[in-house]
Design a protein with these regions (language model features):
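Ligand-binding beta-strand-loop-alpha-helix segment within the catalytic cores
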Residues: 150-180
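FAD-binding core/adjacent interface of flavoenzyme oxidoreductases
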Residues: 139-152
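A glycine-rich helix N-cap at a beta->alpha junction
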Residues: 59, 135-142
Length: 349
């Protein structure tokens, strides 16, 4: 039986990504790893890591097994040689080209999934290219409505908004957008994670989930009407919950995933608990995409000391999703539907 084919993009050439790919290749992970990257960049990364990795041109043929210390490469040429720790905007189009190549390969079935290493958003924007992140790039490529989810072995968190200034968040969360987000999360928990009837905790926007309108009306005007409508259609939705108590360990048994309203509302909890094992994945795409949950670590680039744990976790999750993709979504159990879940008290914080 042939191994799943995973496209791996190396991200920012001056960052830690190329070295992480080399360290990944040194493991015995059971996948056909195809690095979409400049070949010489990988050779220099291997030298910095002090590792001997055999780089093989990707011929597109299926592999039944992969030896540790081997990595297939789909070469893409850098515009200019990297200087570790110093991103160069001249390489921005190279970086975006690797993402396009991966997306096209996944869409055609050439790859089973794409796993992305971190890139430097500021460098791409400095090149005059408007760029918000991987999630938005793949959404635009696929013309798809997507949701960013970060998942650890203990917790799954999806975001109603992603890379927005905090002041822009309330206006960005509308009944239409929140309904769309919850539909995507519900459907993908069933399809990708095999959860027959997902239980989704939805956080409020304001402290204490608005305190009955005394700390903001977004919950009353937007969140509660959406939750009520979707509960009537059979979804199990808890909330809106105050974010300060929603992550208390004893409460987690009541839900399968959390929908947070903005980037820094929930991710600090997740990253503080499971930084090395948290994976970023994009829900709603027609293909599987996972990623590390850390940045380019420019201070470590070139030292050979980068930890590949998050990249390995992203690869393992991609493999799990590929394996599960061949199974039909589970049928929801009968007799379940409207459930507002537990009442989680706020704090005086």
């Amino acid at each position: 039986m042939s191994l799943p084919r995973l496209a791996i993009t190396a991200g920012e050439p001056a960052g830690i990504g190329p070295e992480l790919l080399i360290r990944l290749a040194a493991t015995s992970v059971a996948a056909d790893l195809i690095a979409i990257c400049d070949r010489a960049l990988l050779e220099r990364a291997a030298a910095r890591c002090g590792l001997s990795v055999e780089l093989v041109d990707d011929d597109g043929l299926a592999l039944d097994q992969r030896l540790a210390g081997t990595l297939r490469v789909r070469h893409a040429a850098l515009a200019t040689m990297e200087v570790p720790g110093q991103p160069d905007p001249r390489n921005a189009r190279y970086v975006l080209g690797t993402l396009t190549d991966a997306a096209e390969g996944c869409s055609s079935g050439h790859y089973d999934a794409v796993v992305t290493a971190p890139l430097q958003k500021s460098s791409i924007n400095d090149a005059g290219i408007r760029f918000s992140g991987h999630t938005e790039f793949f959404a635009e490529y696929a013309h798809a409505d997507v949701v960013m989810m970060l998942a650890s072995p203990e917790l799954r968190v999806a975001l109603a908004t992603t890379h927005l200034p905090l002041a822009s968040v309330p206006a960005a969360i509308t009944r239409v957008s929140l309904t769309r987000t919850l539909h995507i999360v519900h459907n993908e928990l069933r399809a990708k994670f095999g959860i027959a009837q997902p239980r989704i905790a939805v956080l409020g926007i304001n402290p204490h989930a608005g305190e009955g309108g005394h700390l903001g009306r977004e919950e009353i005007d937007v969140v509660i009407p959406v939750l009520d409508e979707l509960r009537d259609k059979g979804m199990i939705l808890l909330g809106p919950l105050p974010a300060d108590t929603a992550f208390v360990p004893r409460q987690r048994e009541h839900y399968d995933a959390v929908v947070a309203m903005y980037h820094d509302q929930a991710l600090p909890v997740l990253k503080s608990e499971a930084f090395d094992s948290t994976v970023n994945l994009t829900l709603g795409l027609p293909f599987i995409r996972t990623s590390v949950d850390h940045g380019t670590a420019l201070d470590l680039a070139g030292t050979g000391r980068g930890d590949p744990a998050s990249l390995i976790a992203a690869v393992n999750m991609a493999l799990e999703l590929v394996a599960r993709r061949t199974s039909p979504p589970p049928a929801p159990p009968r007799g379940e539907g409207r459930d507002e879940g537990p009442t989680l008290a706020g704090t005086n914080g």
